[in-house]
């Protein structure tokens, strides 16, 4: 009798080639499956994630599910996995799940965070965990623009090439920015019902250009209309992006 588990994982994405298994690459999915295979004495156990994170993207709350060949208490699964995982990955929560739970298809929303270091020079201790924008920024302009980010829109201009999803309409419930004076960082957060490929990184890059005065405060309204990726142009680095939380019914 197999038991389905819902597991929440945190990881430093710097040294992973993304979430999804790739031949001869170190990936989050592959690392989890390797640990589970060892636990199950060689039986292959497939891991399903809430979504793929790219190389260099971090997670505080990536959710996965898998079917294990025997039932262990949830806390025992957490301890066993953590004893086998590398130092840049940790299981932060483990729960027994119903058979109809699916880490990807049961989601109703996600929350992402993006950190931007505003220092004049690249900080060697932050470069793996933040984006870097060494230009003048008016945070009030960004806050004004965020009101246009929220709502239901066609985000075609903010979807990178390579995505396979045709429907580009998404709803952003919350979009915020906070200036952390102690760290000289901007902290963006976005909560939506779903996100397109590289969407958060493109949104952040566009907001930074608005904050710098390179774009009109309400340029998002124009970008929704033109539906042209080339009009948004820039993509913020993967290093500043964190999958913070995945929401379920």
From Swiss-Prot:
Q: Which reaction does it catalyse?
A: uridine(38/39/40) in tRNA = pseudouridine(38/39/40) in tRNA
- InterPro entries in UniProt: PsdUridine_synth_cat_dom_sf (IPR020103), PsdUridine_synth_TruA (IPR001406), PsdUridine_synth_TruA_a/b_dom (IPR020097), PsdUridine_synth_TruA_C (IPR020095), TruA/RsuA/RluB/E/F_N (IPR020094)
Q: Which residues bind substrate?
A: 112
SUPFAM superfamilies recorded: Pseudouridine synthase
Cite the active-site annotation.
Answer: 54
GO BP: any one term: tRNA pseudouridine synthesis
**GO MF annotation terms:** RNA binding; tRNA pseudouridine(38-40) synthase activity
Q: What is its EC number?
A: 5.4.99.12
- Purpose: Formation of pseudouridine at positions 38, 39 and 40 in the anticodon stem and loop of transfer RNAs.
Quaternary arrangement and interactors, per the entry? Homodimer.
Family that this chain belongs to? Belongs to the tRNA pseudouridine synthase TruA family.
Q: What is this protein called?
A: tRNA pseudouridine synthase A
Gene name as annotated: truA
């Amino acid at each position: 009798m197999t038991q389905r588990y819902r597991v929440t994982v945190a990881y430093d994405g710097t040294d992973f080639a993304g979430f999804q298994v790739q031949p001869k690459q170190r990936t989050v999915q592959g690392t989890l499956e390797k640990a589970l295979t060892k636990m199950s004495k060689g039986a292959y156990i497939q891991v399903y994630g809430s979504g793929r994170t790219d190389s260099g993207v971090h997670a505080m709350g990536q959710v996965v599910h898998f079917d294990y060949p025997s039932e262990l208490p949830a806390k025992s699964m957490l301890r066993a996995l953590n004893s086998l995982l590398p130092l840049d990955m940790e299981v932060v929560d483990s729960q027994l799940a119903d058979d109809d739970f699916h880490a990807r298809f049961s989601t109703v929303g996600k929350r992402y965070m993006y950190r931007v270091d505003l220092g004049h020079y690249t900080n060697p201790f932050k470069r793996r965990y933040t984006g870097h924008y060494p230009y003048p920024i008016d945070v009030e302009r960004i806050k004004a623009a965020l009101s246009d980010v929220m709502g239901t829109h066609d985000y075609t201009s903010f979807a990178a090439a390579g995505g396979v999803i045709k429907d580009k309409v998404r709803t952003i419930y919350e979009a915020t920015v906070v200036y952390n004076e102690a760290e000289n960082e901007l902290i963006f957060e976005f909560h939506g019902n779903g996100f397109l490929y590289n969407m958060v990184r493109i949104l952040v890059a566009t907001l930074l250009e608005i904050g710098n005065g390179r774009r009109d405060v309400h340029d998002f309204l124009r970008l929704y209309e033109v539906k042209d990726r080339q009009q948004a142009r820039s993509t913020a680095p993967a290093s500043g992006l964190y999958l913070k939380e995945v929401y379920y019914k």
